[in-house]
């Protein structure tokens, strides 16, 4: 049985052949057995009829060794029974908007909204998956708009604890192009403008990259910028705001959240409540680029904040039960790599190869845009 702990959801305002290759395919005589079989040719007699001849030819060649048996992969993540692509673009699930709230301050550089949609238990997603949204209307060619994918911001139980809703965290996209025209993102504006009761077409769920690890004692390091916080909110709700018969988190969750201004901090109050609730299991660090600097006077981007704990994080990352997740703006990825390259090099380790091994072990998970 799974229940949700009562917790207020507060939101602030690549064939070639060669002679050598052919030579290597000659069969050794000691591996050939012979028997008589008829071989036909065209008789040169006046009758023109076919006549038989007999010849000694190879008929039994040693069989090649069998191919090695495939080893079944066992994921370290919560993949058992996972549902993928239940609803597709041509047959979406039509849900309804239950809640739509702006969660950035009025002076924040851009609007971000938290929205909740009903699915009545028909979209059995997992923490770390995404859903597609098909906005109403048509494109400039008169065709229905294509879906956009959004990371899910709620646990599998949803914000209301009944496993009948799904939440998204969406930033309204508005920008000025080179011609000086104001451009509005089709789907983001559609979503941010939704009123409670309005219908919305949903697809999915999709994705396995960002699923949580099974190990309840794992160390989970999460780096998110802006709306990249979405999958981590879903993780953290499961860890700290819910009670499950088959899962109790006893490890360490460490969240780094990067935003431009303090009024852009998303779900700040929720995360602070989690820290109060489980101080030994949850660490929280913000990076506010336009308001904070490091000791060198450099702007506090998420990689800058992470650099302050570089040695500690590196030691954690060398352990088999540490999982690293990154979601948000692609720009932060290089900054993180730069830090890790020097730390790894100090121990004679090639970071690029080491990261490849981490990815193979499902310990390095990235979803950036």
Curated annotation (Swiss-Prot):
**What InterPro entries does the entry give?**
FAD-bd_FR_type, Flavoprot_Pyr_Nucl_cyt_Rdtase, FNR, FNR_nucleotide-bd, FNR_plant_Cyanobacteria, OxRdtase_FAD/NAD-bd, Riboflavin_synthase-like_b-brl
Q: Which UniProt keywords apply?
A: Chloroplast, Electron transport, FAD, Flavoprotein, Membrane, NADP, Oxidoreductase, Photosynthesis, Plastid, Thylakoid, Transit peptide, Transport
Biological processes, Gene Ontology terms: electron transport chain; photosynthesis
Residues annotated as binding FAD are: 148-151, 169-171, 175, 186-188, 227
Pathway note: Energy metabolism; photosynthesis
Q: How does it sit in the membrane?
A: Peripheral membrane protein
Cellular component annotations (GO), alphabetically ordered: chloroplast stroma; chloroplast thylakoid membrane protein complex
Q: What is its EC number?
A: 1.18.1.2
CDD domains tied to this protein: CYPOR_like_FNR
What other comment is given for this protein?
Answer: FNR is probably attached to the membrane by a specific binding protein.
Q: Write down what this protein is called.
A: Ferredoxin--NADP reductase, chloroplastic
Instruction: Give the species.
Output: Spinacia oleracea
Q: Which gene encodes it?
A: PETH
